[in-house]
Protein backbone atom coordinates (compact mmCIF):
# COMPACT_ATOMS: atom_id res chain seq x y z
CA UNK A 1 0.00 0.00 0.00
CA UNK A 2 1.12 3.55 -0.76
CA UNK A 3 0.22 6.87 0.85
CA UNK A 4 -0.11 9.33 -2.03
CA UNK A 5 -1.00 12.96 -2.61
CA UNK A 6 -3.02 13.04 -5.81
CA UNK A 7 -2.43 15.62 -8.53
CA UNK A 8 -3.95 16.49 -11.89
CA UNK A 9 -6.37 14.25 -13.80
CA UNK A 10 -5.03 12.06 -16.60
CA UNK A 11 -6.80 10.62 -19.60
CA UNK A 12 -8.54 7.33 -18.87
CA UNK A 13 -10.06 8.02 -15.47
CA UNK A 14 -6.96 8.28 -13.27
CA UNK A 15 -5.18 11.11 -11.49
CA UNK A 16 -1.41 11.50 -11.36
CA UNK A 17 0.63 11.02 -8.19
CA UNK A 18 4.33 10.41 -7.57
CA UNK A 19 6.14 7.92 -5.36
CA UNK A 20 9.94 7.90 -5.09
CA UNK A 21 10.20 9.66 -8.44
CA UNK A 22 7.85 7.23 -10.17
CA UNK A 23 4.56 8.31 -11.75
CA UNK A 24 1.54 6.53 -10.29
CA UNK A 25 -1.84 6.69 -12.06
CA UNK A 26 -4.47 6.47 -9.34
CA UNK A 27 -8.09 5.55 -10.01
CA UNK A 28 -11.02 6.44 -7.71
CA UNK A 29 -9.25 9.58 -6.48
CA UNK A 30 -9.67 13.31 -7.09
CA UNK A 31 -7.07 16.07 -7.45
CA UNK A 32 -5.74 17.28 -4.10
CA UNK A 33 -6.72 14.20 -2.12
CA UNK A 34 -4.42 12.18 0.13
CA UNK A 35 -5.17 8.49 -0.26
CA UNK A 36 -4.04 5.01 0.58
CA UNK A 37 -3.60 3.28 -2.77
CA UNK A 38 -3.20 -0.33 -3.79
CA UNK A 39 -0.82 -0.94 -6.70
CA UNK A 40 -2.55 -2.95 -9.41
CA UNK A 41 0.08 -2.92 -12.14
CA UNK A 42 3.79 -2.11 -12.39
CA UNK A 43 5.16 -0.89 -15.72
CA UNK A 44 8.74 0.18 -15.17
CA UNK A 45 8.66 3.97 -15.05
CA UNK A 46 5.04 4.13 -13.94
CA UNK A 47 2.55 2.20 -11.86
CA UNK A 48 -1.21 1.92 -11.81
CA UNK A 49 -3.07 1.96 -8.52
CA UNK A 50 -6.52 2.44 -7.02
CA UNK A 51 -7.48 4.39 -3.94
CA UNK A 52 -8.83 2.12 -1.21
CA UNK A 53 -8.92 4.68 1.63
CA UNK A 54 -9.34 8.45 1.53
CA UNK A 55 -7.24 10.19 4.20
CA UNK A 56 -7.95 13.76 3.08
CA UNK A 57 -10.99 14.14 0.84
CA UNK A 58 -11.62 16.71 -1.86
CA UNK A 59 -14.64 18.97 -1.30
CA UNK A 60 -15.86 17.58 -4.62
CA UNK A 61 -16.12 14.05 -3.24
CA UNK A 62 -19.58 12.63 -2.50
CA UNK A 63 -20.94 9.24 -1.56
CA UNK A 64 -20.85 7.16 -4.72
CA UNK A 65 -23.97 7.49 -6.85
CA UNK A 66 -23.42 3.94 -8.13
CA UNK A 67 -23.80 1.14 -5.56
CA UNK A 68 -21.71 -1.40 -7.50
CA UNK A 69 -18.79 0.73 -8.76
CA UNK A 70 -15.43 1.21 -7.11
CA UNK A 71 -12.07 -0.35 -6.37
CA UNK A 72 -13.58 -3.69 -5.36
CA UNK A 73 -16.64 -3.44 -7.58
CA UNK A 74 -17.64 -2.94 -11.18
CA UNK A 75 -15.72 -0.76 -13.61
CA UNK A 76 -18.95 0.83 -14.86
CA UNK A 77 -19.04 4.22 -13.08
CA UNK A 78 -15.48 5.28 -12.35
CA UNK A 79 -16.40 8.90 -11.43
CA UNK A 80 -19.54 8.21 -9.43
CA UNK A 81 -17.85 9.56 -6.29
CA UNK A 82 -17.45 13.11 -7.69
CA UNK A 83 -20.16 15.75 -7.84
CA UNK A 84 -21.51 15.84 -11.41
CA UNK A 85 -20.41 19.48 -11.81
CA UNK A 86 -16.84 18.76 -10.67
CA UNK A 87 -16.71 15.71 -12.93
CA UNK A 88 -17.58 17.89 -15.91
CA UNK A 89 -14.80 20.32 -15.01
CA UNK A 90 -12.34 17.47 -14.60
CA UNK A 91 -13.28 16.03 -18.00
CA UNK A 92 -12.80 19.43 -19.59
CA UNK A 93 -9.31 19.65 -18.09
CA UNK A 94 -8.43 16.23 -19.50
CA UNK A 95 -9.64 17.12 -23.00
CA UNK A 96 -7.77 20.44 -22.91
CA UNK A 97 -4.57 18.65 -21.92
CA UNK A 98 -4.92 16.04 -24.67
CA UNK A 99 -5.69 18.66 -27.31
CA UNK A 100 -2.60 20.69 -26.38
CA UNK A 101 -0.23 17.70 -26.14
CA UNK A 102 -1.46 15.60 -29.07
CA UNK A 103 -3.33 18.04 -31.28
CA UNK A 104 -1.39 21.27 -30.88
CA UNK A 105 -4.67 23.09 -30.22
CA UNK A 106 -5.48 25.38 -27.30
CA UNK A 107 -8.94 24.97 -25.78
CA UNK A 108 -10.39 25.75 -22.37
CA UNK A 109 -13.78 24.71 -21.06
CA UNK A 110 -15.73 21.97 -19.38
CA UNK A 111 -17.98 19.17 -20.51
CA UNK A 112 -21.57 20.25 -21.13
CA UNK A 113 -24.61 18.44 -19.79
CA UNK A 114 -26.63 16.50 -22.36
CA UNK A 115 -30.40 16.79 -22.10
CA UNK A 116 -32.22 16.96 -18.79
CA UNK A 117 -31.87 13.36 -17.60
CA UNK A 118 -29.22 14.15 -15.00
CA UNK A 119 -26.27 12.02 -13.97
CA UNK A 120 -28.20 8.79 -13.42
CA UNK A 121 -30.62 6.67 -15.43
CA UNK A 122 -29.52 8.03 -18.81
CA UNK A 123 -28.47 4.85 -20.61
CA UNK A 124 -30.64 3.24 -23.32
CA UNK A 125 -28.38 0.33 -24.31
CA UNK A 126 -26.43 -2.13 -22.16
CA UNK A 127 -24.34 -5.18 -22.98
CA UNK A 128 -23.80 -7.80 -20.28
CA UNK A 129 -21.44 -10.76 -20.37
CA UNK A 130 -22.28 -14.15 -18.89
CA UNK A 131 -19.73 -15.78 -16.58
CA UNK A 132 -18.19 -19.03 -17.76
CA UNK A 133 -16.88 -20.59 -14.56
CA UNK A 134 -17.07 -20.69 -10.79
CA UNK A 135 -20.05 -19.79 -8.65
CA UNK A 136 -21.02 -17.04 -11.09
CA UNK A 137 -21.20 -19.34 -14.13
CA UNK A 138 -24.40 -18.68 -16.06
CA UNK A 139 -25.01 -15.29 -14.42
CA UNK A 140 -24.88 -12.01 -16.34
CA UNK A 141 -22.86 -9.08 -15.10
CA UNK A 142 -20.62 -6.07 -15.60
CA UNK A 143 -16.85 -6.43 -15.81
CA UNK A 144 -14.54 -5.29 -13.09
CA UNK A 145 -12.03 -2.76 -14.38
CA UNK A 146 -9.65 -4.41 -16.89
CA UNK A 147 -10.70 -7.86 -15.72
CA UNK A 148 -12.60 -10.88 -17.00
CA UNK A 149 -14.27 -11.15 -13.58
CA UNK A 150 -17.89 -10.06 -13.42
CA UNK A 151 -20.02 -8.22 -10.88
CA UNK A 152 -23.41 -9.90 -11.13
CA UNK A 153 -25.32 -7.31 -9.15
CA UNK A 154 -26.90 -5.22 -11.91
CA UNK A 155 -27.83 -2.01 -10.07
CA UNK A 156 -25.56 0.29 -12.11
CA UNK A 157 -26.58 3.93 -11.70
CA UNK A 158 -26.34 4.62 -15.44
CA UNK A 159 -29.27 2.30 -16.06
CA UNK A 160 -32.90 3.45 -15.76
CA UNK A 161 -35.01 1.75 -13.13
CA UNK A 162 -36.35 -1.57 -14.36
CA UNK A 163 -34.15 -1.83 -17.45
CA UNK A 164 -32.28 -4.87 -16.12
CA UNK A 165 -34.96 -6.22 -13.78
CA UNK A 166 -35.08 -10.00 -13.61
CA UNK A 167 -31.94 -10.58 -15.66
CA UNK A 168 -29.74 -11.10 -12.60
CA UNK A 169 -31.86 -13.96 -11.26
CA UNK A 170 -31.91 -15.93 -14.52
CA UNK A 171 -29.35 -18.47 -15.72
CA UNK A 172 -27.84 -17.96 -19.17
CA UNK A 173 -25.51 -20.00 -21.36
CA UNK A 174 -21.95 -19.43 -20.08
CA UNK A 175 -20.00 -17.23 -22.49
CA UNK A 176 -23.10 -15.62 -23.98
CA UNK A 177 -23.80 -11.90 -24.12
CA UNK A 178 -27.04 -10.09 -23.35
CA UNK A 179 -27.88 -6.96 -25.32
CA UNK A 180 -30.56 -4.83 -23.69
CA UNK A 181 -32.19 -1.77 -25.26
CA UNK A 182 -35.01 0.59 -24.35
CA UNK A 183 -36.98 1.91 -27.31
CA UNK A 184 -38.54 5.34 -27.73
CA UNK A 185 -41.62 4.28 -25.74
CA UNK A 186 -39.54 2.82 -22.90
CA UNK A 187 -40.24 -0.82 -23.81
CA UNK A 188 -37.42 -3.29 -23.18
CA UNK A 189 -35.82 -5.53 -25.79
CA UNK A 190 -33.35 -8.28 -24.83
CA UNK A 191 -31.28 -10.24 -27.33
CA UNK A 192 -28.85 -13.04 -26.45
CA UNK A 193 -25.84 -13.66 -28.67
CA UNK A 194 -23.51 -16.63 -28.35
CA UNK A 195 -21.88 -18.54 -26.97
CA UNK A 196 -19.84 -19.35 -30.03
CA UNK A 197 -20.05 -22.90 -31.35
CA UNK A 198 -18.07 -24.08 -34.38
CA UNK A 199 -17.13 -20.45 -35.13
CA UNK A 200 -20.76 -19.36 -35.19
CA UNK A 201 -22.61 -17.33 -32.57
CA UNK A 202 -26.34 -17.87 -32.27
CA UNK A 203 -28.76 -14.97 -31.80
CA UNK A 204 -31.96 -15.32 -29.80
CA UNK A 205 -34.62 -12.75 -28.94
CA UNK A 206 -35.32 -13.17 -25.23
CA UNK A 207 -37.80 -10.32 -24.80
CA UNK A 208 -39.41 -7.79 -27.11
CA UNK A 209 -38.01 -7.82 -30.63
CA UNK A 210 -34.69 -7.87 -32.43
CA UNK A 211 -35.03 -4.19 -33.31
CA UNK A 212 -35.76 -1.21 -31.07
CA UNK A 213 -37.53 1.85 -32.44
CA UNK A 214 -35.77 5.18 -31.90
CA UNK A 215 -36.87 8.65 -32.92
CA UNK A 216 -34.86 11.76 -33.78
CA UNK A 217 -36.81 14.78 -34.95
CA UNK A 218 -39.64 13.67 -37.21
CA UNK A 219 -37.95 10.46 -38.32
CA UNK A 220 -38.04 6.96 -36.85
CA UNK A 221 -35.33 4.28 -36.91
CA UNK A 222 -35.66 0.56 -36.25
CA UNK A 223 -32.19 -0.39 -35.04
CA UNK A 224 -31.03 -3.92 -34.14
CA UNK A 225 -30.52 -4.27 -30.40
CA UNK A 226 -27.03 -5.59 -31.17
CA UNK A 227 -26.10 -2.62 -33.41
CA UNK A 228 -24.74 0.78 -32.46
CA UNK A 229 -27.00 3.54 -31.20
CA UNK A 230 -26.02 6.43 -28.97
CA UNK A 231 -26.02 5.24 -25.35
CA UNK A 232 -27.36 8.47 -23.81
CA UNK A 233 -31.06 8.96 -24.43
CA UNK A 234 -30.58 12.58 -25.54
CA UNK A 235 -27.28 12.24 -27.41
CA UNK A 236 -28.58 11.52 -30.92
CA UNK A 237 -30.88 14.56 -30.83
CA UNK A 238 -28.16 16.80 -29.42
CA UNK A 239 -25.49 15.85 -31.95
CA UNK A 240 -27.95 15.83 -34.85
CA UNK A 241 -28.98 19.43 -34.19
CA UNK A 242 -25.35 20.49 -33.79
CA UNK A 243 -24.28 18.81 -37.05
CA UNK A 244 -27.12 20.44 -38.96
CA UNK A 245 -26.15 23.90 -37.74
CA UNK A 246 -22.40 23.52 -38.16
CA UNK A 247 -22.59 21.94 -41.63
CA UNK A 248 -23.88 25.18 -43.22
CA UNK A 249 -25.18 23.27 -46.23
CA UNK A 250 -27.38 24.73 -48.95
CA UNK A 251 -29.52 22.99 -51.61
CA UNK A 252 -27.51 21.17 -54.27
CA UNK A 253 -24.45 20.52 -52.12
CA UNK A 254 -22.83 17.14 -51.39
CA UNK A 255 -22.23 15.73 -47.90
CA UNK A 256 -20.49 12.61 -46.65
CA UNK A 257 -21.66 10.89 -43.46
CA UNK A 258 -18.68 8.68 -42.58
CA UNK A 259 -18.94 5.96 -39.93
CA UNK A 260 -22.59 6.86 -40.38
CA UNK A 261 -24.23 4.05 -38.41
CA UNK A 262 -27.99 4.14 -38.82
CA UNK A 263 -27.89 7.43 -40.72
CA UNK A 264 -29.01 9.93 -38.10
CA UNK A 265 -26.64 12.58 -39.41
CA UNK A 266 -27.39 11.64 -43.02
CA UNK A 267 -31.02 12.54 -42.35
CA UNK A 268 -30.30 16.13 -41.31
CA UNK A 269 -27.68 16.56 -44.01
CA UNK A 270 -30.23 15.39 -46.58
CA UNK A 271 -32.76 17.94 -45.34
CA UNK A 272 -30.24 20.71 -45.96
CA UNK A 273 -29.00 19.69 -49.43
CA UNK A 274 -32.47 18.80 -50.73
CA UNK A 275 -33.36 16.74 -53.78
CA UNK A 276 -30.80 18.54 -55.93
CA UNK A 277 -27.99 17.54 -53.58
CA UNK A 278 -26.41 14.26 -52.59
CA UNK A 279 -25.57 12.53 -49.30
CA UNK A 280 -23.38 9.44 -48.97
CA UNK A 281 -23.53 7.48 -45.69
CA UNK A 282 -20.81 4.88 -45.09
CA UNK A 283 -20.52 2.23 -42.38
CA UNK A 284 -19.15 -1.30 -42.12
CA UNK A 285 -22.08 -2.62 -40.05
CA UNK A 286 -24.67 -4.42 -42.16
CA UNK A 287 -27.28 -4.07 -39.41
CA UNK A 288 -26.77 -0.33 -39.14
CA UNK A 289 -26.79 0.06 -42.92
CA UNK A 290 -30.10 -1.81 -43.17
CA UNK A 291 -31.57 0.47 -40.52
CA UNK A 292 -30.31 3.52 -42.42
CA UNK A 293 -31.76 2.38 -45.74
CA UNK A 294 -35.13 1.70 -44.14
CA UNK A 295 -35.27 5.00 -42.24
CA UNK A 296 -34.12 7.08 -45.22
CA UNK A 297 -36.00 5.20 -47.94
CA UNK A 298 -37.98 8.31 -48.92
CA UNK A 299 -34.81 10.32 -49.57
CA UNK A 300 -33.71 9.33 -53.07
CA UNK A 301 -30.66 11.58 -52.91
CA UNK A 302 -29.14 9.57 -50.04
CA UNK A 303 -26.92 6.56 -50.79
CA UNK A 304 -26.01 4.13 -48.01
CA UNK A 305 -22.82 2.17 -48.57
CA UNK A 306 -21.74 -0.84 -46.50
CA UNK A 307 -17.99 -0.48 -46.75
CA UNK A 308 -14.95 0.73 -44.86
CA UNK A 309 -14.52 4.49 -44.90
CA UNK A 310 -11.03 4.14 -46.30
CA UNK A 311 -12.19 2.12 -49.29
CA UNK A 312 -15.25 4.28 -49.86
CA UNK A 313 -13.17 7.45 -49.98
CA UNK A 314 -10.89 5.87 -52.55
CA UNK A 315 -13.79 5.44 -54.99
CA UNK A 316 -15.47 8.85 -54.75
CA UNK A 317 -15.29 11.07 -57.81
CA UNK A 318 -17.54 13.84 -56.51
CA UNK A 319 -16.00 16.07 -53.85
CA UNK A 320 -18.00 16.67 -50.71
CA UNK A 321 -18.76 20.16 -49.47
CA UNK A 322 -18.96 18.79 -45.92
CA UNK A 323 -17.84 15.53 -44.33
CA UNK A 324 -19.14 14.35 -40.95
CA UNK A 325 -17.11 11.69 -39.15
CA UNK A 326 -18.10 9.74 -36.03
CA UNK A 327 -15.36 7.08 -35.88
CA UNK A 328 -14.89 4.38 -33.22
CA UNK A 329 -12.84 5.00 -30.08
CA UNK A 330 -9.58 4.51 -31.97
CA UNK A 331 -10.34 7.58 -34.10
CA UNK A 332 -10.26 8.11 -37.85
CA UNK A 333 -6.48 7.94 -38.09
CA UNK A 334 -3.90 9.16 -40.53
CA UNK A 335 -4.96 7.23 -43.64
CA UNK A 336 -8.58 8.40 -43.60
CA UNK A 337 -7.68 12.01 -42.77
CA UNK A 338 -5.04 12.02 -45.52
CA UNK A 339 -7.74 10.89 -47.99
CA UNK A 340 -10.15 13.62 -46.84
CA UNK A 341 -7.45 16.24 -47.23
CA UNK A 342 -6.47 14.90 -50.65
CA UNK A 343 -10.13 15.13 -51.69
CA UNK A 344 -10.10 18.80 -50.70
CA UNK A 345 -13.15 18.60 -48.44
CA UNK A 346 -13.42 22.22 -47.25
CA UNK A 347 -15.46 21.64 -44.09
CA UNK A 348 -15.31 18.72 -41.65
CA UNK A 349 -17.31 17.94 -38.52
CA UNK A 350 -15.44 15.39 -36.42
CA UNK A 351 -16.93 13.57 -33.43
CA UNK A 352 -14.89 11.48 -31.01
CA UNK A 353 -15.65 9.57 -27.81
CA UNK A 354 -12.03 9.16 -26.65
CA UNK A 355 -10.09 12.29 -25.79
CA UNK A 356 -6.62 11.16 -26.90
CA UNK A 357 -7.80 9.72 -30.22
CA UNK A 358 -9.85 12.84 -30.89
CA UNK A 359 -6.88 15.09 -30.12
CA UNK A 360 -4.58 13.09 -32.40
CA UNK A 361 -7.12 13.38 -35.21
CA UNK A 362 -7.35 17.15 -34.66
CA UNK A 363 -3.57 17.31 -34.95
CA UNK A 364 -3.66 15.37 -38.23
CA UNK A 365 -6.23 17.77 -39.67
CA UNK A 366 -4.16 20.76 -38.59
CA UNK A 367 -1.17 19.25 -40.37
CA UNK A 368 -3.18 19.43 -43.59
CA UNK A 369 -4.06 23.09 -43.13
CA UNK A 370 -7.41 22.71 -41.37
CA UNK A 371 -8.25 25.08 -38.52
CA UNK A 372 -10.66 24.42 -35.66
CA UNK A 373 -13.57 26.87 -35.92
CA UNK A 374 -15.43 25.63 -32.88
CA UNK A 375 -15.12 22.76 -30.42
CA UNK A 376 -17.53 21.48 -27.80
CA UNK A 377 -17.25 18.69 -25.25
CA UNK A 378 -20.30 16.83 -23.99
CA UNK A 379 -20.77 14.87 -20.77
CA UNK A 380 -22.54 12.12 -22.70
CA UNK A 381 -21.50 9.40 -20.24
CA UNK A 382 -22.18 10.80 -16.75
CA UNK A 383 -20.54 9.04 -13.77
CA UNK A 384 -17.70 7.88 -16.05
CA UNK A 385 -14.51 9.48 -17.35
CA UNK A 386 -15.76 9.22 -20.95
CA UNK A 387 -16.78 12.27 -23.00
CA UNK A 388 -17.92 13.09 -26.51
CA UNK A 389 -15.94 15.77 -28.35
CA UNK A 390 -17.23 17.55 -31.45
CA UNK A 391 -15.22 19.93 -33.61
CA UNK A 392 -15.89 21.73 -36.86
CA UNK A 393 -12.78 22.35 -38.95
CA UNK A 394 -12.29 24.22 -42.20
CA UNK A 395 -9.44 24.68 -44.62
CA UNK A 396 -7.58 27.82 -43.66
Where do the model's predicted regions map?
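Accessory RNA-recognition modules of RNA-modification enzymes
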Residues: 1-325, 330-338, 344
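Short hydrophobic/aromatic beta-strand or adjacent loop that forms the aromatic wall/cage
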Residues: 123-125, 386-390
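Short loop segments at secondary-structure junctions
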Residues: 133, 395-396
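S-adenosylmethionine
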Residues: 305-387, 394
Amino acid sequence: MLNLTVGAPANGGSCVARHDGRVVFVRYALPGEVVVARVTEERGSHWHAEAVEILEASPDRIESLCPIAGADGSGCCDLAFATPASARRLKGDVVANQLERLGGHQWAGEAEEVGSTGATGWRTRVRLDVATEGAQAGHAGFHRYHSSDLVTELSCAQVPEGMLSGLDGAKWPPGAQLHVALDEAGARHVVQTGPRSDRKASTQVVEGSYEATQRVGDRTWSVPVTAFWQAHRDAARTYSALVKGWAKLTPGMTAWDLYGGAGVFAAVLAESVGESGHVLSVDTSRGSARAARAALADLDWVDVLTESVRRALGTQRRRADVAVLDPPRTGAGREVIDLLAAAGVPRIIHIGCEAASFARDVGLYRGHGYAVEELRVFDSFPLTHHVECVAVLSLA
